[in-house]
């Protein structure tokens, strides 16, 4: 039974059919050199740790000088329960094996043979004290018992008392947990999805009658943060969920492993493998202290089976699974480290994780697959002071490698993640089958200074990304200033995100603050939501690309800026969906003046390009605004689109518009090794399939007055998301205070500060769901001098990532609504704010706003339309700090009611 679109895939046999991709033979070991040590299962030196200690002794004795100690690794499996740890004293070592399938560093252990029960469930004994959250059976990853077997359960209602870790479930969905004893209930894990990440929380308590479930682990955002549809979750790790082939359950009390076999498995030939070591190799360098691990290389070595423990409370969600600092191979402070013709497989968390102060690292001709999280994560500190300069990482090369099948445990893992690093190259790789992004660059939100420079992502095949599980992703995804960086000659296809809450998915995605990037000569095809997305940024260039077979829009620009955000030049946009558009995104058509578009060719193969294809405007209006003077609406004359033959026939109008043909088949692995190429071509993923449409979330009434929260706390009513994790030690925060509330005894204080990440924090959000009638929202607001609060009312239910109906701000001491000046904001005085928003009927869209300072006269304004005409429902209320200065303001007495005729 399948797992498509949820935490697991439906055909684990195909995903993990490693035998079909085995290299026929290892690469030659290169020019013969001196062998100083032989590591062999039956030799004098039998363990990797003993070999490393012997190498250290050889170097200390002076027997080896001026070159690395050569350690020949004989075929065999070398079992590690603890990682092989390199310090600076272990520099200049080379481990060389004949083949990564023959010489394997193994972090797991085999259990006793299975016995088959009459009910078809196999079992085997588990040694006392052995605890694990991953399992492999017959070399293939098995699935921890889970319900539902495919796709998701949906949370019914938010719990306002504990919005980040509690919710109300449908009673039938949690009924199987009702009879569990407390110790078994505490081991049940709740998998939670939130747009671009997911996490786990073990059950703290359950009220089966009401369906109220509380997790021990809080998620980083309120569970109903995205609220157009009900949030997703699944339940794992209890006996009643064991009901499908390939699933397993560890009965801790009975010390037994229970397993339902997959087709073709027999007890005589099938063994279970349990991971023991969390890492196989650790590089314990510290560049700031002058302790650098240098000149270490591995050739022809396999690294298999590592564990990731979800822990007694769970593990919080985080973009790119960046909160999980565990990898099969991991460390910091390395220099001249290389992996050639290696294999990293069957991991609990990331494959290779190298952090602060790692420089000149090469991964070549290496297979990285079957990953609990991401493939390769590389990056260090982003120093704002010179004292941290040693933490900067640089000069990573990932070349001619295959990185695939990630996110088995932590779906937000990325194929290759590069953050706070410069002069890196990811070239000629096959990167596929991840639930989140393929390659990521950056890791600074907004326009703050970064160390990211001259990074190159080129000639990669990146495909089958997203798989319908997460959102707000890209085949290539960037953040922050990346001056001098280039994304070129990549072939990207099938990037598809979750179709429910959260932002969509794109082929190329320049997210918050991206600047200085050039995207050229890329082929981006069949990315449902769109080919490219510019959130906000500065001077990014998309030039000479093929953007093909998208459904919603070729290009998106979300936030208007007062400078050039993006240049889109000499590209071909070609789509087949008659409802597809060339351009979409935030703001009005008039706001599109921050982009430069010219020389682009647009064509809808299903018929005429619709009149609203250019951000709601037609071609003539688009050109009248100054765009695409050299562009055209014309068939590019592809050779055979039905067969993905995107060559241009003679006379193509794309050529006269300035497009230069390029060979997208040059992307991917290279060389003469036929087996390596065949491995890259192997189809080991499932066909994409969307989850069923999630039920809508309807909440028409809300109350929040902060009275029940202790002074100094961050409230989780409505869902409060403060930048406490993202900005440790920074002054920006939320807190309940008892000084001068609008009513009662308490209010909520917002304190903004410069350089907070993300730049829209602190923030408080309220999930709701009003589609009809009149939504009546009221709250009290008090500002201090210089404060610039923003209140946004959003609709997440449409085709856009979201639309904004109302944006109320305080700027220069004045209340402004949707750009219209209203009245003065008196410092230190509470203002009662009331909005009435008709969402249906003859007055739909004609809304009103009243602001009344305490002790003063009211100011009232009527509006004929919402900020965005596509705003149709109120699903999200946000109180946001967009400011970049130190400022303070207060919120109290939030109320939402809905009137129906």
Describe the role of every protein-language-model region.
Residues 38-345, 384-389, 624-634, 643-698:
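Extracellular polysaccharide-degrading/modifying enzymes targeting complex plant/algal/animal polysaccharides
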Residues 281, 308-331, 345, 349-359, ...:
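Glycine- and acidic/polar-rich repeat regions and solenoidal domains
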Residues 301, 401, 571, 600, ...:
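Extracellular beta-strand elements of beta-rich domains used
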Residues 710-749:
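Extracellular glycan-recognition surfaces and repeat-rich motifs
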Residues 741-812:
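Secretory/extracellular carbohydrate-interaction modules
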Residues 779, 827, 835-864:
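Carbohydrate-binding surfaces in secreted/extracellular proteins
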Residues 815-834:
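Short, aromatic/His-centered strand-loop micro-motif at the edge of beta-sheets
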Residues 860-890:
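Flexible glycan-contacting loops in extracellular carbohydrate-active proteins
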